[in-house]
């Protein structure tokens, strides 16, 4: 078997590092062909020394220059590229077999679309591609003959729980024809699911980033605490699985053992279970339709004391309700909400606003954006930019 060339968009982030771990566990199957990051020179330098990619790219031009000099000094032949255009070109490189799209935020949008337009096999971990582009993105996957495989643990669980006919029709699944009655999206509820609501005003960034089950970056950890993460995943699931609002259900499952479920019309429920480790869905997508070793500890059923399920409380998780309503309002609303949330979460981490302010800023930003039918990627970027400015203004007020 010839080694698969993997391009990792966001190699210095949490998903990127987990992807490199899977590659390290399967050196005979995969090669880290190109590594892409933002401006973290040290992390990228260490990855280049260990994995010897053909290419490394950083979005920050000055950081790329420093990286290039360090690699030359250590006689590492990796070619260093810089800037957004170079990253998009790597995402579409003719020698790339699979693209791990894991750049967090709207910054990952254009490189991911480049991979899709090159007809690549895209392992999708970037939520924003679907949250902001939705129909545009799904249509591009179909029109350019790209293969889309969901990496998010919940969407990957749903994917694994669906019949092969649905797996081959991502974005256009005829759920009712296949006997699917509900897609059940599970979430841990974050670290504050039992915290009294009156204490929410005192929540600190340190408390918010301490997720009880998953190891994640700061932004995603805060999103998990507000359940915006689940809201974004709800939007993603609607697009990925062509699901109506009536075909969706969100439940809180504190143990994070069941990663999501599919309910069928005959009364069956198929669930995907496993230890909360992102290497499992990453390995599943990389090897699909086969399986490969991920380095993950097998689930020990004797250590699982209980599996519990709770109905989400929208008073506790206003961001979840906001995301559900934003999907119903249209693509402009989900794009604005996503942009505002990125700004609001960073402001919270920088101690400029309170934990409770995040949802308020997101909601007010959507209210201030005029309803608009998105026609193309330029429309998406325009609304994204508008929403960011509105959110920044709201933070200053």
UniProtKB/Swiss-Prot annotation:
Mn(2+) binds at residues 152, 154, 233. Its EC number is 1.1.1.267. It catalyses: 2-C-methyl-D-erythritol 4-phosphate + NADP(+) = 1-deoxy-D-xylulose 5-phosphate + NADPH + H(+). One of its GO terms (biological process) is isopentenyl diphosphate biosynthetic process, methylerythritol 4-phosphate pathway involved in terpenoid biosynthetic process. It holds the Pfam family DXP_reductoisom. GO terms for molecular function: 1-deoxy-D-xylulose-5-phosphate reductoisomerase activity; manganese ion binding; NADPH binding. Keywords: Isoprene biosynthesis, Manganese, Metal-binding, NADP, Oxidoreductase. Pathway: Isoprenoid biosynthesis; isopentenyl diphosphate biosynthesis via DXP pathway; isopentenyl diphosphate from 1-deoxy-D-xylulose 5-phosphate: step 1/6. NADPH binds at residues 12-15, 38-40, 126, 128, 217. Its cofactor is Mg(2+); Mn(2+). Belongs to the DXR family. NCBIfam families: Dxr, PRK05447.1-1, PRK12464.1. PANTHER family: 1-DEOXY-D-XYLULOSE 5-PHOSPHATE REDUCTOISOMERASE, 1-DEOXY-D-XYLULOSE 5-PHOSPHATE REDUCTOISOMERASE, CHLOROPLASTIC. Catalyzes the NADPH-dependent rearrangement and reduction of 1-deoxy-D-xylulose-5-phosphate (DXP) to 2-C-methyl-D-erythritol 4-phosphate (MEP). This is 1-deoxy-D-xylulose 5-phosphate reductoisomerase. It comes from Haemophilus influenzae (strain 86-028NP). The gene is dxr.
